[in-house]
Amino acid sequence: MIKQNLVVKIPPMLAGTELLSALEVLPDYDESIRDLDAATRLMALSDLYKLYLPSQMSVEIYSKLYLALLHSLQKKQTSLAIQQQKQNYRAIRQQTYSGIIGGSDSFTIIGASGIGKSTAISRAISLITGNKVIEVEEPYTTIVPCLVVQCPFDSSVKGLLLEILRKVDEYLGSKYYENAMRVRATTDMLIGSVSQVALNHIGLLVVDEIQNVVNSKHGKSLVGALTQLINNSGISVCMVGTPESALFFEQAMQLARRSLGIQYGSMRYDAYFEEFSDVLFSYQFVRNETILTPGIMEWLYEHSAGIISVVVSLVHDAQEIAILSGKECLNLETLNMAYQQRLSLLHGYIEPAITKKPQSTTTKQNAPATKVI
């Protein structure tokens, strides 16, 4: 009965057109804004960064996170969970303890920087949780459905554990972080404490920027701590990072097993890219409207290397330059000015001279989400 009560506390799972519609974000836009003064148009121009068109990646991430949360909730307040609470208390007291409840789920979401991983995850979590904390009456408890933390830059195990406690306090108004700092808890004590907190109050834990473990001597220790947390709490853990983190997890079997998941590259020149470019180009704040041509679309792809955040930056900065310079036109001239003046540090990564459009534009690919990270 308890498991059913927890599951019904989250919104029903969506799919198909209903899911795409729920994920989509189209900022309000009125063409008459092009006749307003420059200051007003420049301020409204930032709405481009709010645009979000769900892609195949968005759908897959939503489904993966929803099912992982569901699996985690189904293990809470069972007889095994109660036994695990006693073991975690022993860990806090620095006594011998063991993991009884077992791991729920551990997976990765890996993709190049700028393809929209974090935004896709944020949109999915917002839809899955409704931005609400789960409350259960008997026995009374509160659960954060999805908790997102960042991997410390130095891969500090203690830093990550304290950050989890701090984020839980933000949602629940508790004092776990304050108490841990007051007693100067050791890492071993913190693992027991965080396991207990996760068992009682966390559904799904998302650890972003996991690539920080790659070049740190504490990297394997941090992944080991996450594994121990999974086994002692039964919650699902999602690790998000760039492709370099995949090389780290491939080093050993125990790491590879914990990093099974989904991977994405830059966007293909396909129907989705064309649709996204068309929608993005409809948000024009310059006085003279420009029609999106196949030539401009190809230019955008070649000068972004299929990285969606770069596409948005190009169109945004080109309009900003056009307004400030008085050119008032979004065309190849202003787009090229934006590329040369604003994106110079990315030239070595984009290389438009050798980035060519694939012959076929009809093959379906796992395209990334559409907004910058």
Regions found by a protein language model. Give the residues of each.
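Conserved catalytic segments around the Walker B and adjacent sensor/switch elements
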Residues: 133-152
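Walker A/P-loop nucleotide-binding motif
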Residues: 97-122
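Post-Walker A helix-loop "phosphate-sensing" segment adjacent to the P-loop in P-loop NTPases
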Residues: 127-139, 170-173
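Walker A/P-loop-proximal flanking segment of P-loop NTPase domains
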Residues: 1-105
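Mid-core helix/loop region of P-loop NTP-binding domains shared across ATPases and GTPases
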Residues: 78-81, 85-92, 98-102, 156-163, ...
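The catalytic "switch" region of P-loop NTPases
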Residues: 194, 214, 224-295
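The feature captures the helix immediately C-terminal to the Walker
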Residues: 122-126, 312
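C-terminal alpha-helical "lid" subdomain
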Residues: 1-34, 45-48, 52, 199, ...
